[in-house]
């Protein structure tokens, strides 16, 4: 879900409602769930704010989104730091590592807030807690990628891909297509 929302957040500058419509339209291609829609709208708003509003505080935004979904991420992060606790104390005890949206998306927001300035540490921490880490990682990567920019992604993660040259061409073509649309 995150790539179309991120792209629409960029293309729909200043129009959160348009971004939300795109997010819900995409979600409804495969799911009809008010719970999923609630979470999709939080992601949509978060990405929109990161992409369109200068100086946004990603940890604060992520904690706010988590709070709206019923998870006190700011308080949990504070407790984890005070007690030198592990991410396993959060994902596995407070939140399930499974794919259920009411557990997995707050987990993503927890990681986005806790590791807001370190893309690599965030993705590694997510991976280490196990469970549905691939899907969480995709969304976490989109949040931190939007916040920190492409330079925050370790170069070895990009150039070390088996089909790096082919993927690089596809990405450049994709970006060029949307750059053309933005230029008129």
Where are these regions (language model features)?
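A generic structural signal for well-ordered alpha-helical surface patches
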Residues: 106, 110, 120-124, 137-138, ...
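Short, small-residue alpha-helix embedded
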Residues: 6, 137-148
């Amino acid at each position: 879900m995150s790539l179309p929302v991120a792209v629409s957040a960029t293309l729909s500058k200043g129009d959160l409602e348009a971004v939300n419509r795109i997010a819900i339209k995409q979600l409804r291609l495969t799911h009809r769930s008010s719970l999923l829609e609630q979470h999709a709208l939080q992601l949509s708003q978060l990405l929109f704010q990161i992409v369109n509003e200068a100086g946004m505080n990603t940890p604060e935004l992520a904690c706010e989104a988590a709070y709206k979904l019923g998870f006190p991420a700011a308080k949990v992060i504070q407790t984890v730091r005070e007690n030198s606790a592990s991410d396993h104390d959060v994902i596995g005890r407070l939140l399930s590592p499974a794919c259920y949206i009411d557990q997995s998306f707050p987990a993503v927001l927890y990681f986005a807030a806790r590791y807001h300035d370190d893309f690599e540490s965030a993705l590694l921490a997510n991976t280490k807690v196990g469970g549905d880490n691939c899907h969480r990682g995709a969304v976490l990567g989109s949040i931190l990628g939007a916040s920190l920019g492409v330079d925050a992604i370790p170069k070895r993660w990009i150039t070390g891909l088996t089909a790096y040259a082919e993927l690089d061409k596809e990405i450049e073509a994709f970006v060029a297509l949307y750059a053309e649309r933005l230029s008129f």
